Amino acid sequence: MTFAELVDRVGSKGPFQLLHTVLLGLPILGMANHNLLQIFTAPTPAHHCRPPPNASAGPWVLPTGLNGKPETCLRFVYPPNASLPNDTRGATEPCLDGWIYNIVDRDSIVTEWDLVCSSSKLKEMAQSVFMAGILVGGLVLGALSDRFGRKPILIFSYLLLGASGSGAAFSPTFSIYAVFRFLCGFSISGISLSTAILNVEWVSTRFRAIKSIAVGFFYTFGQFILPGLAYAIPQWRWLQLTVSVPFLTFFLLSWWLPESIRWMVLSGKSSKALKTLRQVAIFNGKKEEGEKLSLEELKLNLQKEISLAKARHGIADLFRTPVLRRVTLCLSLAWFATGFAYYSLAMGVEEFGVNLYVLQLIFGGVDVPAKFITMLSISYLGRHITEGIVLLLAGGCILALIFVPLDLMTLRTVLAVFGKGCLSGSFSCLFLYTSELYPTVIRQTGMGASNLWARVGSMTAPLVKITGELQPFIPNIIFGTIALLGGSAALFLPETLNRPLPETIEDIETWSLRAKEPKPEPEAEKSSQRIPLQPCEPGPGPS
């Protein structure tokens, strides 16, 4: 009996699983708000230099740019030099007295701390700091999760996100705000890692994909909620606080969640694991089945996993053989390209000149059909074809934005939305594809290393946007080219459709060699080719 069959005995699709999914999914919904929060807490409104004290705002104070609008980062020197001829343009200087912002409906960290002109890089830096927190959190909390358990790390991460998110709302300076945002990203890694493991443990094998997709849709719905919250709460501090406080509630509710049964058995806590299984059986109305379970049966069902856990494998094993080297390098590039390009579009909503709230709803909504189409494609066309196509299409859309004039806002928006949908599909495909390509003995290591590259990409994306100050088209060239390279690399990966999962490193080597061998002609087909033709009996005519 396998562990999945053991879960079936205590109930794998009962009320416990429903409540378990909701309790894990609601924080994921809130996590989407934090990931995309800077879209609404850091928009840059139209602005120009504040005139010097006691000076009128005449044309000699605010120089006019080529577009006929006031310069955003320069003003005329005051008082003007009277010795200059009338046709001479006056000398200019930076905005020494601050800026005037065209604030229509909301404030932001940009308007509060003047993150414009020479300080505009700090806005992108804030998002990179947040992504760096996710990167560091994945490295630190992943290791702590293996040592102390999934549940303690999840509980700690809920508390840390609620506290650090609330702290960011009360930050007196940008530096303190950045520190709290780093901690927010750090805690988000703990939530996503622990949720991914706990989510699929309490269902049978055939329902794992459904439960995984169900929790994934909580993130999509979170993208719908954020624009509504931002529209109702125009003050960035209150918005930051609103999306953070619920995690203090999740912290209290998470004590009800059970620890990973596998982790408890592998950590020598089999008695506690058995007690948890019996509690789940009672909750699902299968008390008698729960009482029949024994410690010996539980250990026997997890004997294989216990043996695999004793074998030590590390990052170096991802490069041990030629096939694994190819898989690791191609997957790393695909993950990096996806995270890199995804956040370039997701965080660039305000660049398309469309209503910020409406466009974010569209950006969130495109994930629904994108994930559905991706699931159909990977089930029929295969994994590497699907992954290659969606990344190539995304790269093409980003590069096409270079050639579309700024006044064609509808076309630019369509390209961006389509590209973002392709990248969302790429994430969905990669999570499944990566788990199928790596053998069981290094699967968790491979997943962690691959996901790390997505975090590096998402952390780098805001910094690349700064190159737009040199030429507006440079960021899109970089984002689009990397996406094309990632899509091309995916095409060199072996196909996993309808193949059993490899258990050992030797399995994937043998598996790859078999894929290169010509398929033998089925015996039934050979026989059918040798069947002699027989005369057909005339059938009955129409009555």
Swiss-Prot record:
Residues 43-124, 173-181, 234-237, 350-355, 410-412, 494-543 are extracellular. Signal peptide: none annotated. Its main location: membrane. PROSITE patterns: MFS. It is a multi-pass membrane protein. One of its GO terms (molecular function) is antiporter activity. GO terms for biological process: monoatomic ion transport; organic anion transport; prostaglandin transport; response to toxic substance. Residues 1-21, 146-151, 203-212, 259-328, 377-388, 434-472 are cytoplasmic. It catalyses: estrone 3-sulfate(out) + glutarate(in) = estrone 3-sulfate(in) + glutarate(out); estrone 3-sulfate(in) + 2-oxoglutarate(out) = estrone 3-sulfate(out) + 2-oxoglutarate(in); glutarate(in) + 2-oxoglutarate(out) = glutarate(out) + 2-oxoglutarate(in); urate(in) + 2-oxoglutarate(out) = urate(out) + 2-oxoglutarate(in). Residues 514-528 have a biased composition (Basic and acidic residues). Keywords: Cell membrane, Detoxification, Glycoprotein, Ion transport, Lipid transport, Membrane, Transmembrane, Transmembrane helix, Transport. SUPFAM superfamilies: MFS general substrate transporter. Residues 513-543 are annotated as: Disordered. Glycans are attached at residue 81. The chain crosses the membrane at residues 22-42, 125-145, 152-172, 182-202, 213-233, 238-258, 329-349, 356-376, 389-409, 413-433, 473-493. Expressed in kidney. It is found in: Basolateral cell membrane. GO terms for cellular component: basolateral plasma membrane. NCBIfam families: 2A0119. Belongs to the major facilitator (TC 2.A.1) superfamily. Organic cation transporter (TC 2.A.1.19) family. Functions as an organic anion/dicarboxylate exchanger that couples organic anion uptake indirectly to the sodium gradient. Transports organic anions such as estrone 3-sulfate (E1S) and urate in exchange for dicarboxylates such as glutarate or ketoglutarate (2-oxoglutarate). Plays an important role in the excretion of endogenous and exogenous organic anions, especially from the kidney and the brain. E1S transport is pH- and chloride-dependent and may also involve E1S/cGMP exchange. This is Organic anion transporter 3. It comes from Sus scrofa.
